[in-house]
Amino acid sequence: MSRGYVIQADTDPELYQAELLANSIKIKNKNAQVCLLTSRNLEADAFDDIVKYEFFMHEEVVDIRQKDWQLYWCSPYEYTIAIDCKSVVMESHDNLWEYLIDNHSVCLPTVVKDFRNNTLVDKQLSKYEQEYKYKKAYGNCFYFDKSEESLEYFKFLDPLCRDWRSTEGFLFQKQHANKKYYSNLIHTIAANSMRFDVFPTSNDMLSYIDMDIAWSDGILPDGENWLDVMSVWSTDIATLKIQNYSINNILYYHEDSFYNNEIADDFRNYRETINK
């Protein structure tokens, strides 16, 4: 039984972020297998596998998450957790894996939190919940296996990712269509269209900290982005704090400026130390 994590990255910033994420996974999940999914030809010590995309996309790709539909075919693992590259993992997933494998073909979180562990309202997805009766689903961390049900999900996801503008134009009123690709909405559409249950039995399963939604919900101080008004600290034993709050979950930080050499070195060096 093979299980592992898949991270997508193509640009230089994404590749740096993916390496940080891989190191964080291996610190908290020592025997974890981590795969980099990319269009590039490269080698990197942080990854156990490096896989290239199976399919070329003729459509304009402005967000790597438009390639989510390829994950089923590209993952080298029987059981996969896919995580957005702009994330760090600060928790063990032993119990999570056991739950997911035993209960789901595909599973997406239904709740995201702020760095204080408060559940976020998510004003953007809430309008689709209110107007179109969609149950919220989040796509920055989700699980799938190689079953027929999972294949059904990714086949459905394919045209949504490729032609998301037409999809939103067909499904939603004009004022509810987005100008930018919004991965959470695409996965929400797919999740609510399945004949099988993709939602976890507990809201805490797969839940993660989403600093982008915390920012857009307006619960943080004003600024260009959350890093302009909040401090982040890492240590040489790969701990992480935002303000005075220790991060002990999956953190989706969203902003490219989160990544810096100090954080990257702290996590890389600590992973190498504990694996000696």
Predicted segments, located by residue:
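N-terminal anchoring/stem segment of glycosyltransferases
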Residues: 1-59, 178, 246-276
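Short, highly selective alpha-helical patches that border small-molecule cofactor pockets
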Residues: 18, 22, 118-120, 184
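A structural signal for short, well-ordered beta-strand segments and their strand-loop junctions
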Residues: 35-38, 81-84, 89, 106-109, ...
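Short loop segments at secondary-structure junctions
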Residues: 41, 75-77, 145-149
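A glycosyltransferase accessory/donor-loop signature
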Residues: 46-51, 129-141, 145-276
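Conserved phosphate/oxyanion-binding catalytic-loop motifs
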Residues: 62
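GT-A fold catalytic core of metal-dependent nucleotide-sugar glycosyltransferases
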Residues: 67-118
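A short, conserved beta-to-alpha structural element at the edge of catalytic cores
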Residues: 107-130, 269-273
